Amino acid sequence: MHFDQRTQSALREVGLSMDEIRAASDHVVAATEDAATDLETFFEGRETVYSDMDQAHSASEIQEHAVEYLDLYTHADDIRGYLRFDSWGVPVEAGRVITENEVIELTLGPTVQDRVRFASDPDQL
């Protein structure tokens, strides 16, 4: 079950049955899995993507990246994984689709430690 005990209790207090709470939990899990699939699909078949990532030795606001892969897994409402660029990689701690098949946002872990938007076209950032 996705919801912790406090949340389950609150949902019961507003009148939801355990079956309804389980159904809601299942919907959260399915939505998370769909989001992870959409995020991975964004990078598939693209040789180059653009981002608003803050990089130490770049004066540009928009960065260009060659991405080898995005590998994600889900647990309840968490999306985690690894984003591999051509010469380095970074853990992924969360993500969401902003504009379907055009702009996504990933929360990147150590070495970046920031939310970064990626787009198929630099003008979309």
Residue ranges and their predicted role:
Residues 41-97:
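Long, charge-patterned amphipathic interaction tracts in eukaryotic proteins
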Residues 1-3, 8, 70-75, 95, ...:
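Short, well-ordered helical secondary-structure segments
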Residues 11, 16, 21, 25, ...:
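Generic hydrophobic secondary-structure signal
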Residues 77-125:
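Amphipathic alpha-helical binding modules
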Residues 1-56:
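N-terminal interaction modules that seed assembly of large macromolecular complexes
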